[in-house]
UniProtKB/Swiss-Prot annotation:
Transmembrane segments: 40-60
Propeptide residue intervals: 1-24
Protein name: Photosystem II reaction center protein K
One of the protein's GO biological processes: photosynthesis
SUPFAM superfamilies: Photosystem II reaction center protein K, PsbK
Primary location class: plastid
Function: One of the components of the core complex of photosystem II (PSII). PSII is a light-driven water:plastoquinone oxidoreductase that uses light energy to abstract electrons from H(2)O, generating O(2) and a proton gradient subsequently used for ATP formation. It consists of a core antenna complex that captures photons, and an electron transfer chain that converts photonic excitation into a charge separation.
Membrane topology: Single-pass membrane protein
Record-stated family: Belongs to the PsbK family.
Binding partners and assembly: PSII is composed of 1 copy each of membrane proteins PsbA, PsbB, PsbC, PsbD, PsbE, PsbF, PsbH, PsbI, PsbJ, PsbK, PsbL, PsbM, PsbT, PsbX, PsbY, PsbZ, Psb30/Ycf12, at least 3 peripheral proteins of the oxygen-evolving complex and a large number of cofactors. It forms dimeric complexes.
Taxonomic classification: Eukaryota, Viridiplantae, Streptophyta, Embryophyta, Tracheophyta
HAMAP family reported in the protein's UniProt record: PSII_PsbK
Length: 61
């Protein structure tokens, strides 16, 4: 159990101190893809919401 907590703390610390990981810039050659890359993290949320819409369509069987 201690190993899990230490792994989580290591991940959180590395995520907090490497802000360039979250706010990295694409190379110049791929700059035209910036709008697509900005939207990509939201795509899994759409699939999650689609599951609820699908279940509502079949009356939550």
């Amino acid at each position: 159990m201690l190993n899990i907590f230490s792994l989580i703390s290591i991940c959180l610390n590395s995520a907090l101190y490497s802000s360039s990981f979250f706010f990295g810039k694409l190379p110049e050659a791929y700059a035209f893809l910036n709008p697509i890359v900005d939207v990509m993290p939201v795509i899994p949320v759409f699939f999650f919401l689609l599951a609820f819409v699908w279940q509502a369509a079949v009356s939550f069987r």
